[in-house]
Amino acid sequence: MKSWNRNRCRQYDLFSAITIGTALLVIFFIGSAISAVIISGIPCFAETIRSEDVLFAFRLSVTTASISTVIVMALALPTAYALTRTDMPFKRLSGLMIELTLSLPYILLGLSLLIIFSSPAGKWLKEHGFKVVFSPAGIVMAHILVNLPYAVRLIRTAFEASDRRLEFIAQTLGASPWKCFLTILLPLCRGSLTSAFILTWSRALGEFGATLMLVGVTRFKTETLPGSIYLSISTGNNPTAMATAMLMLMISGCTLALAQVLGKSPYGRERQVGH
């Protein structure tokens, strides 16, 4: 028995050593990439963040990301609720379609939007003042298409993990589905919803593939921070590109920290199903 226990401990120690070694390798790989951006971006950082084109790109990125995230959350909340709390028709097919969108290349999503808004319907919208192709409005549309499935998944997971017994009790006492949603489900998932909003905003800030396909990158018109990096690399201005990348890295780090702090449950930890 003692010999069997010793062999089991050796196997466990070997497995632990392999997993720790793999984790350290992954951390080193990711840390090297982050360090390369920081080291290369520091020399020109102060000058770059004061340049007119980077300031324009920063303002446009923050504005479009904020607008698109508000729209995404407004659409994702009822969609996630319908997928988790109702018997909507084709619910399984709808969920699979949303998951499929997550696996598609962003440039393909941008191409689909370009086809839609270059169609007669898109031209009609343009004639009536809603121009999307090669305009800042197109950036918002690209962000919405890319991030909406992601937000739906986050919110859907939060809704599925919430304790439904409280909603059942409220409904037996005469509460409407809207009342249960507003007074029970949203407060229970407040931390997860806050994290979903912040992470969706961060993804919108860094989105580039769909935006490039739909609106292109033009200085002082459709130039976001990722677009600014792209233009700097295209013109051989690598120091400015790395400094801009460092700025995006700092913003991403701050948003991640904010999501960790604000995304905590008001009860100290997230409620688990059945507890």
Where do the protein language model's features map onto the residues?
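Glycine-rich helix-loop "coupling/hinge" segments at transmembrane-helix boundaries
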Residues: 210-236
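Membrane-water interface segments at the C-terminal ends of transmembrane alpha-helices
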Residues: 8-43, 52-160, 188-208, 232, ...
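Glycine/proline-centered hinge or cleavage motifs at structural transition points of membrane proteins
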Residues: 173-174, 187
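Short hydrophobic faces within alpha-helices
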Residues: 100, 166-173, 241
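Membrane-helix/interface signature in polytopic inner-membrane proteins
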Residues: 156-167, 177
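Short coil/turn motifs that cap or connect alpha-helices
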Residues: 89, 176-177
